[in-house]
């Protein structure tokens, strides 16, 4: 479970996707681009935060 994940609007999500695509177009791997964007979002986000739980689907 992850606590304190930023709660993003659709527009904010779209901008994040576009930023990830830009980073990948510049040669960054998808994993690095996603990690960088997540770090930027956590550092700059001032809105609500959610708690998310991810479960392994194979169980």
UniProtKB/Swiss-Prot annotation:
InterPro entries: UPF0181 (IPR005371). It comes from the Bacteria. Pfam families: UPF0181. HAMAP family: UPF0181. Belongs to the UPF0181 family. This is UPF0181 protein YoaH. It comes from Escherichia coli (strain SMS-3-5 / SECEC).
């Amino acid at each position: 479970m992850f606590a304190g994940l930023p709660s993003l609007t659709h527009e904010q999500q779209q901008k994040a996707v576009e930023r990830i695509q830009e980073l990948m177009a510049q040669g960054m791997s998808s994993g690095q681009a996603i990690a960088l964007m997540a770090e930027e979002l956590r550092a700059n986000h001032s809105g609500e935060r959610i708690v998310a739980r991810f479960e392994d689907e194979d169980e």
